[in-house]
Amino acid sequence: MKIDVYVKGRWYLSEPTDLSGRQIDDIWQFLDGRRIADPGPLSIPLSRPGKALDIDFAGAGQAPIVKASLANVFRVLAPNDVQLFPVKIEGQAEPFFLLNVARTVRAIDDAACEEARRWAPEDDEPEKIGQYHVVSGLRIDKAKVESERVFRLWGWPSPIIIDEEIKEELERVGASGARFDEV
């Protein structure tokens, strides 16, 4: 599951802030694929007004933001895989939630991907050695997925991987702003 940037007239969300408007300390924590401490009440300003989406990804940190009906899908079908934190979106009365994916699985199938390259010592990025540098035509090895229904990928955290039942339920309740690609 990832952002559908082709929704005409869509809104764009800024970085999450606390209720006084201060940016939170670590905007990247929502990409880590691990449980986090409750960040407390959050607010999300709009960087560009437009059509409200059912799911979007806020700011540079790409924190997933979902409306209440989608949050309920995750709460019911994947309670051990996610955390949901209420957020107030500028100009919206409807409740939204920050979706923190709390699981990471080492499941990229390098051989089945169109391309999968990892950071190497000669790349002069020592903290990234072994992590993925490029992944295109993403494919996962489903045998490496155990009970997880929603997770991030080790070394390549941007996509949110969801199982088929969750995808179908999200589509049934309405998931404007999301794009689903089989991996």
Predicted regions and their residues:
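Phosphate/anion-contacting hairpin/loop surfaces
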Residues: 1-183
